[in-house]
């Protein structure tokens, strides 16, 4: 899994698959797209207007939490 952010276009992308694949993009809303592989698996999730969506969550920080251990890691967003 990899999360990328493009500040030029204010887009964040959560890529769930490591290998490149042909995808079909499903528009969920004006600010959310989901990419599906031909076999129906979720390849990635694209957040448009990302800073607005992600800043509303945790004061401008991306928080990753391991629910099994309770450990968290915070990453400041640009």
Language model features: what each stretch is:
Residues 1-78:
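Small, basic N-terminal interaction modules of short regulatory proteins
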